[in-house]
């Protein structure tokens, strides 16, 4: 074991955190830990280049959304303790109704549907408030008769849950590394997808009983027409990754659909809509 390790810490606005995490999880990093005060990245290798990549990504986001986005980071060299084991101790298994999400080093629950996700190797583990409420919706609306699409699949956790519930599942993400992560996690959980591709919802030639999109509000608005188009008449559209302050904005964009339910957790919310038959 080396005598020192490097710890990179960063903070950003909550509505953009998932975009930064997508970048971080796509890199070869030993351990990533998300806490209330921000995100910690630890490695025995110097990670200065990761800090530079995050700073550059921040600048590009500000330009893309034409707004000021808060970002702060620090990089420290620290005395090495067995930080990988300490990191593992800090990761808690999570039970959401009948779904139990755990890591490869934690035990499954015999009476639950078990989902294996290692947070350091994925784009999402279920602990985020928006993912949590999304999973609650999926358990309510998904069954073996459904044809489903996961838009912005990240780690594949939502796709895997739908597959475990018996649905026929397709998934997409604009990040090629997310597709790789989803496929690896599907294999780990012994499920398969009907199709998965690099790109967005508009590449699909199908319509679905359930479309789920757990992505930030700005992207949901950009994809509004495609999300509605790919939802079958009588189908369910689940939107998540929405900060409470954007609730009215999102509801206004999707007001032509029937709002079935709103779930709140912390500063985030998820919405379940039905596309009525004309």
UniProtKB/Swiss-Prot annotation:
Name the record gives this protein: Ribosomal protein L11 methyltransferase
GO CC terms in record: cytoplasm
Stretches assigned to coiled coil: none
Principal location listed in the UniProt entry: cytoplasm
Subcellular location: Cytoplasm
Job description of the protein: Methylates ribosomal protein L11.
The organism of origin for this protein: Campylobacter lari (strain RM2100 / D67 / ATCC BAA-1060)
Family statement drawn from the similarity comment of this UniProt entry: Belongs to the methyltransferase superfamily. PrmA family.
One BP term from GO: methylation
Keyword Cell division tagged: no
Single GO MF descriptor: protein-lysine N-methyltransferase activity
Database matches in Pfam families: PrmA (PF06325)
Keywords from the UniProt entry: Cytoplasm, Methyltransferase, S-adenosyl-L-methionine, Transferase
Record-linked InterPro entries: Ribosomal_L11_MeTrfase_PrmA (IPR050078), Ribosomal_PrmA_MeTrfase (IPR004498), SAM-dependent_MTases_sf (IPR029063)
Enzymatic reactions: L-lysyl-[protein] + 3 S-adenosyl-L-methionine = N(6),N(6),N(6)-trimethyl-L-lysyl-[protein] + 3 S-adenosyl-L-homocysteine + 3 H(+)
UniProt binding sites for S-adenosyl-L-methionine: 131, 152, 173, 214
Gene3D superfamilies: Vaccinia Virus protein VP39 (3.40.50.150)
EC number per UniProt: 2.1.1.-
